[in-house]
Every structure is written in C-alpha cells, then in structure tokens.
C-alpha cells in the first residue's frame, strides 16, 4: 500500500510538472491553435499616389496624425534619457518617459518596478487610460533608439488606426512572431484597446512569463496580442527595405562597405527609415543634425506632405 501511495504521489508530481510545461509552451504556440494568420509585410505609401491627393486633403491628413511616444527608462540611462529628451522626442505630438523609480533629474512617470515587462504593461495601460481619446497611434522605444517621427507618420499615412496594427521590425522565435522592442513598437488605438482588455486576464496575458524561464518583454507583448487577434507586421519601404532598424546607422554602413562596397548607399538602409537603435548620446545629437538641420544650399525639398509640430513644441 505504501509503495502504491508513493507511486501515486510521484505520478501526481510528474503530471503537474508536465501540465505546467505544456501551459507555458502554449503561451508561445497559441498562434497555430487559436488563430490562423499568415504574416505579411506592410509597405509605406507610394509617393506618386500621395501627389495625386489634393492639397487640402493633404493638409487635413498631416493634421490628423497624432503620435504619442512612450520611452522606457531606468536611472542608469540618465545620459541617454537627456539626449532623447533633447532630440527626436520633440517631434512626437506628446512624449512621456516611464521610469523604474523616481528620478529627480528628469520628470517621469514612476512604474515602481525594475521588470521591463511590468514596466511596459503599466506604461501601455497608463497611456490608454489617459489618452485613448487624444491619440490614434502609440510608439514605444528604448532610450538607445533614435526615431524620425515624420517618417513614421508618412508610413502610417494610409493605415486606419481603427484596425489592429502592431508594427515594427519582426523577429521569429519558434512559432512566435514578434516586433523587436530594439527597433521600436507601434500600436494603433484598436490594438491598444484590445491589449488593455487583456491586461487583467492573467490566463491570456500574465504578469510573469513562466515558472521556469522568463521571456523578454517584447515576446510577452506578442503573446498577449495574439490572444487579442493582433499579429506582428514587418514595416518596409517600397523597395522592401526595413524602416524600423535594430542597429545603428553606423553599423549598417560598415556592413554595406564590407558586403556591397560598390553600392554602400543602396546597400545600407532605407531613405524612409523610421528608427535606428544602439546609439550613444553623442550619436543621437549627430543624427539630429543630419536629419533635421543640415541642408544643401540651393536645394529645394519637394515633400508632398508637411507634418506640423504640436503647438508649443521646441522641435527643430
């Protein structure tokens, strides 16, 4: 009898462990079981099509785009924080910094946790609860990321925010396709709405990734969004080049010089790039100079659209 009881207890323990593993793997593999969705690549609008739009409609389009920027920071990032605050975030319609703790040097929203997934969850909930009626696109980035917000708005020009968009640089991990946080993550207001509805459902969007191992915050986000029927989309220009980049422009140039020495510019990156990552504070300011301040005398830029800065903005 004792032997049978011992065998029974061993069976229960092994069964429990097996069920836990299956549950965790289920979070990663839910795409095939719950939803049928074939990943596709989204491209920026054609410039010729934009030129066909009347000037009045173009002005209305440029005014209608409202992008709210979320930057996740920690106290150790203070020099990067300062650079981001002084450079590209001025071009967001509104930008706020979400920190792991109170930092006296800069204004931020305290998430009171060092866990990046919890920070991301709390930041998205805060943004949705407070700004769901003001902004239709939400862009999240690391403090090592440089973003050209005007290029982001151009890319989103013909995309309906009432549809569930989840955009950026996609990466595949097993059966899970997710947008890498290194290149920045874009969610439409519809995706924010669906995500917000799942944040309080631990069975579908848990605060912790698992009992045995922990997955990164961008993978956690993809798991939650899959349950909401929202899937990762890779953002590209008309030539199929990525516009959300997980590396710095300097690294891309070095790679192009090695791999395509006769076509460095063509082999580097998209003319309509939205983000680059892995930048130092000094590189942020150099990028700002190159993107917004340097101009060739006598050269006229014939942009079909002009995205106006928010009222009171100090952007370049």
Curated annotation (Swiss-Prot):
Stretches assigned to the Cytoplasmic side = 1-6
Main localization is: membrane
Lumenal membrane side: 27-316
Residues passing through the membrane, by range = 7-26
The UniProt entry, under Gene3D superfamilies, shows: 3.90.550.50
Cellular-component GO terms for this entry: membrane
Q: Which UniProt keywords apply?
A: Chaperone, Membrane, Signal-anchor, Transmembrane, Transmembrane helix
Keyword Transmembrane appears in the UniProt entry:
yes
- Provide the coiled-coil residue spans: none
GO biological process annotations for this chain's record?
platelet activation; platelet morphogenesis; protein O-linked glycosylation
* Membrane topology category: Single-pass type II membrane protein
InterPro entries registered for this protein in UniProt: C1GALT1/C1GALT1_chp1
Provide the GO MF annotations for this entry. Answer: glycoprotein-N-acetylgalactosamine 3-beta-galactosyltransferase activity
Task: Quote the subcellular location field of this record.
Answer: Membrane
Please state which protein family the record places this protein in. Belongs to the glycosyltransferase 31 family. Beta3-Gal-T subfamily.
- PANTHER family hit by this protein: BETA1,3-GALACTOSYLTRANSFERASE, C1GALT1-SPECIFIC CHAPERONE 1
- Give the protein's function: Probable chaperone required for the generation of 1 O-glycan Gal-beta1-3GalNAc-alpha1-Ser/Thr (T antigen), which is a precursor for many extended O-glycans in glycoproteins. Probably acts as a specific molecular chaperone assisting the folding/stability of core 1 beta-3-galactosyltransferase (C1GALT1).
Quaternary assembly: Associates with core 1 beta-3-galactosyltransferase (C1GALT1), probably not with the soluble active form.
Q: What is this protein called?
A: C1GALT1-specific chaperone 1
Which source organism?
Rattus norvegicus (Rat)
Q: What is the lineage of its organism?
A: Eukaryota, Metazoa, Chordata, Craniata, Vertebrata
